[in-house]
Amino acid sequence: MINLIEIRRQLHQIPEIGLEEYETQKYLLAIIQELTQNKPFIQVRTWQTGILVYLAGSQSQKTIGWRTDIDGLPIEELTDLPYASKNGRMHACGHDIHMTVALGLLEKMSESQPRDNLLFLFQPAEENEAGGKLMYDARAFENWLPDEFYGLHVRPDLKVGDIATNQHTLFAGTCEVELSFIGTGGHAAFPHTANDALVAAAYFITQVQTIVSRNVDPLASAVVTFGKMEAGTTNNIIAERAFLHGTIRSLTQEVNELTQKRLRELANGIAQSFNMEIELKLKQGGYLPVENHPKLAKELMEFFKKETKANLIDIAPAMTGEDFGYLLSKIPGVMFWLGIDSDAPLHSQKMNPDEHVLNFSVDTISQFLQFKVNRLSEGEKTIN
């Protein structure tokens, strides 16, 4: 039986940026090989730094998918733990927990051949390149494409034992925004001979907030945030360029597209009024809203509601983004939050999950997967 805490701590020490998860993939493959050897019903494929593990069913009618992400973040860890992430990278979003749970589930589910097919996806590049979309568009699944897809994300403000989801939208769709205003530089004493890009950018920052307050239905939800602005070189030189980096988030794709449209119109209008050029890049890619399939979500919620170890929470949507939304736009499925009881939030340099979540997750979620792939009646358990 694999040691979940040891695996999680080893994975935690080797975080890698999306599509560069070479050491992570090597480590995962070694454990996967150990778990699946001498089991002819299991096959393994790789796609770039991703891994697909397929358990062929004995009487297959469909394929159930379980997805985990494997990449880390460019953050320096400040927990002072002996197994802290290294080299200016950190598993600050809990993907080390996600991977460890997936390996534990694979161990449980590979003990005997399931009736239906079961696919484990170890997906790269969730944080930066929408790896799920990349794999889907590259046809990496081939004939292993699931009929239903499931996945989880850790949540620090929930307790170990909490499983939280809903029957509609769980996560927002996100769109990255990069915008540059291009004017004419000059001496601060002669502003009339220059064209100040910083002033135009500041004007845009204030005007762009009217999209949410005046263009989006008050009963809908959207966020437009610019967290980065770069302009100028010193105090007495008028800035020739001003660069803005921000994000759009919404709970529906319709609102996201409306917000993108209005942002583009505002940027062009302000550029025209200041007689400037702009460079605008809107990057949404695979970060669509995470839309749970109502029927499948109801089934999952009813299952965990009856699970004595779990505390099922019907939770409101969150403005966090997840590229699992793209896969769920192609394949019906469900994502849920998993409580890890950390004082520090996701993407924090001090995020430190309670490792008791590992055994709880594997024991509880494996029962759900058994229920799905072996077509058990509700409440029926398998003996592992």
Curated annotation (Swiss-Prot):
Reaction(s) catalysed by this chain's protein: N-acetyl-(2S,6S)-2,6-diaminopimelate + H2O = (2S,6S)-2,6-diaminopimelate + acetate
Record keyword Amino-acid biosynthesis present: yes
InterPro entries: AcetylDAP_deacetylase, Amidohydrolase, Bact_exopeptidase_dim_dom, Peptidase_M20, Peptidase_M20_dimer
Protein keywords: Amino-acid biosynthesis, Diaminopimelate biosynthesis, Hydrolase, Lysine biosynthesis
Pfam (any one): M20_dimer
Entry-linked HAMAP family: DapEL
Family: Belongs to the peptidase M20A family. N-acetyldiaminopimelate deacetylase subfamily.
Protein name: N-acetyldiaminopimelate deacetylase
Natural source organism: Lactococcus lactis subsp. lactis (strain IL1403) (Streptococcus lactis)
Gene name of this polypeptide: yciA
